[in-house]
UniProtKB/Swiss-Prot annotation:
Family (UniProt): Belongs to the class I-like SAM-binding methyltransferase superfamily. TRM61 family.
Function: Catalytic subunit of tRNA (adenine-N(1)-)-methyltransferase, which catalyzes the formation of N(1)-methyladenine at position 58 (m1A58) in initiator methionyl-tRNA.
Disulfide links within the chain: none
Organism: Kluyveromyces lactis (strain ATCC 8585 / CBS 2359 / DSM 70799 / NBRC 1267 / NRRL Y-1140 / WM37)
The protein, known as: tRNA (adenine(58)-N(1))-methyltransferase catalytic subunit TRM61
EC number: 2.1.1.220
Reactions mediated catalytically: adenosine(58) in tRNA + S-adenosyl-L-methionine = N(1)-methyladenosine(58) in tRNA + S-adenosyl-L-homocysteine + H(+)
GO cellular component: nucleus; tRNA (m1A) methyltransferase complex
Length: 407
């Protein structure tokens, strides 16, 4: 069983662990006895990790000093893997992937098509949640890298993940015996895989070319949900046209923007405190001037060799005052009950997730409907509505689909 599907208590040799260096810096490690993991915090022996519970802190003493460096060793999950994985392409981060899976109603009985494996970030999330994942990658080098990665992580061994080397825009989604794929065929040479997919995720430069090829591989028994991941609004526009031409319904485009908030407590600063501070500065200024004048008078009367007076020492070492929220003073721990505090927060300026437009649609195959008649009916609107706005054309096409279903 894959480490991404179930939790383990302790680390064993050969396990994949994620070394937590900071919130945005995680490093994947395959634990091997005798090897060393080098970081700016020091060198950590893999042997020290074996037998420790996941989540443990591994600490070492820095040579030549009393300072300690440490890391945390974590259980790999799809969410943490998306932060630490080696990037071969842009990836789908957790803020997007979690929303996509919820909207597509992905569950352990779902059969998912993912076109555009890329770095495999979303593939791990699908493999954990879905009944079976069919992933496609057109780039041969990335296909081999992803296949090896899935094998090492136990996704192929679990039997619910199939990755195929294919350009789905040109060659479609059907998997047959003889194709370059991780699926193990048994039986005659003409054997092909029954996909019956009910969740479709397209992360492609031109998803509108792949949408017509979905007809033969989607489920005929239940509702099919689709999501297209497109960085540019021009891609969204062409995708919407393709979805409507193929009879997809409930089309909606959204964008997810996730920012983190840093929350802390800040001491309440009042006007009386500011006025008192100004008075204190003015009072100390006058006292300093008076002490300096006395010192000058004593020096002129007793000669230049007179040692520093007590007043000089007082000027160099002024007594510390109580805490001043507007200036220097005694240190106060955040949240001290002797002072009044208020809750404040600050949002990070940059959006670190890869933001794109998410276009959702759904389809239910009506076996009683004549698909040829449907396309001919929609073609009349395409010809008559060529001078209309795109929004009006979409409205007419949607109305045509409803009229056909009533017939």
């Amino acid at each position: 069983m894959s480490q991404f599907f179930e939790y383990k208590d302790t680390i064993k040799e050969g396990d994949l662990v994620l070394a937590w260096l900071s919130r945005d810096n995680l490093k994947p490690i395959t634990v091997k006895a005798g090897e060393v993991f080098n970081t700016r915090y020091g060198a950590f022996s893999h042997s020290d990790m074996i037998g420790k519970p996941f989540g443990s802190q591994i600490a070492i003493r820095t040579k030549g000093s009393n300072r300690f460096g440490f890391i945390h060793v974590l259980q790999p999950t799809p969410e943490l893997w998306s932060i630490s994985l080696p990037h071969r392409t842009q990836i789908v981060y957790t803020p997007d992937s979690s929303y996509i899976m919820q909207r597509m109603e992905c569950n352990p009985r779902s059969r998912v098509i993912e076109a555009g494996t890329g770095s495999g970030s979303f593939s791990h999330a699908f493999a954990r949640s879905a009944g079976h994942l069919f992933s496609y990658e057109f780039h041969e080098v990335r296909y081999e890298q992803a296949k090896q990665e899935f094998k090492e992580h136990g996704l192929l061994e679990a039997g619910n993940t199939t990755i195929t080397h294919r350009d789905v825009c040109k060659d479609g989604f059907e998997i047959k015996n003889g194709d370059t794929t991780s699926h193990e065929f048994r039986g005659p040479e003409e054997t092909k895989v029954e996909l019956n997919a009910d969740c479709i995720f397209l992360d492609l430069p031109a998803p509108w070319d792949a949408i017509p090829n979905l007809t033969s591989v989607i489920s005929k028994e239940k509702k099919v949900n689709l999501c297209c991941f497109s960085p540019c609004i021009e891609q969204v526009d062409k995708t919407l046209e393709a979805l409507e031409e193929e009879g997809w319904q409930d089309v909606q485009t959204v964008e997810i923007q996730g920012r983190q908030y840093e929350a802390r407590r800040q001491m309440v600063r009042r006007l009386d405190d500011a006025i008192e501070r100004l008075r204190d500065v003015k009072r100390r200024k006058h006292e300093g001037v008076e002490k300096r004048q006395k010192n000058v008078e004593q020096t002129s009367n007793n000669g230049s060799s007179v040692e520093a007076t007590e007043s000089d020492k007082d000027l160099k070492h002024t007594e510390k005052t109580h805490f001043n929220p507007f200036g220097k003073g005694s240190r106060v721990k955040e949240g001290d009950s002797n002072f009044e505090w208020t809750q404040v927060s600050k949002v990070e300026l940059e959006i670190k997730s890869h933001t794109s437009f998410l276009t959702f649609a759904s389809k239910i195959i009506d076996r009683t409907r004549d698909e040829e008649q449907t396309k001919a009916y929609l073609a009349t609107f395409k010809d008559e509505g060529s001078k209309l706005s795109k929004r009006e054309q979409r409205r007419l096409k949607a109305q045509a689909n409803k009229d056909i279903q009533k017939e």
